[in-house]
From Swiss-Prot:
Stored Gene3D superfamilies: F0F1 ATP synthase delta/epsilon subunit, N-terminal
Protein name, UniProt field: ATP synthase epsilon chain
Organism for this UniProt entry: Helicobacter pylori (strain ATCC 700392 / 26695)
Gene expressing this chain: atpC
UniProt record, GO biological process: proton motive force-driven ATP synthesis
Family recorded in the similarity comment: Belongs to the ATPase epsilon chain family.
Tagged with keyword Ion transport: yes
UniProt keyword Ion transport present: yes
Assembly and oligomerization: F-type ATPases have 2 components, CF(1) - the catalytic core - and CF(0) - the membrane proton channel. CF(1) has five subunits: alpha(3), beta(3), gamma(1), delta(1), epsilon(1). CF(0) has three main subunits: a, b and c.
Key words of the record: ATP synthesis, Cell inner membrane, Cell membrane, CF(1), Hydrogen ion transport, Ion transport, Membrane, Transport
Location in the cell: Cell inner membrane
HAMAP family: ATP_synth_epsil_bac
SUPFAM superfamilies: Epsilon subunit of F1F0-ATP synthase N-terminal domain
PANTHER family membership: ATP SYNTHASE DELTA/EPSILON CHAIN, ATP SYNTHASE EPSILON CHAIN, CHLOROPLASTIC
Amino acid sequence: MALLKISVVVPEGEVYTGEVKSVVLPGVEGEFGVLYGHSNMITLLQAGVIEIETENQKEHIAINWGYAEVTNERVDILADGAVFIKKESDDRDDAISRAKKLLEDASSDRLAVSSVLAKIESL
């Protein structure tokens, strides 16, 4: 299976880069998945969680909003704010707290934010 290249960048610098099997993005019209060979597109992203599937694990990045450029072999994400939540990390609890704060500050829509926060808490 061919791998997809992905990069997640915020104004302060790069949050994540790598080769992945798939990625699920929080689009403004709903979540959508991207695999190698996807059609080209540029889309707006809403507050949510980017789900990244690598060869051997799933990783998560919370974003407040941003843009994604998708080509058949890569995904480039420019976000206003992002927190990489590493599954097995000493600062995981701190990352989850920062992700919750980022998402709470991103939207006044409490219902939408609460569903994303529930997703983060289940990681």
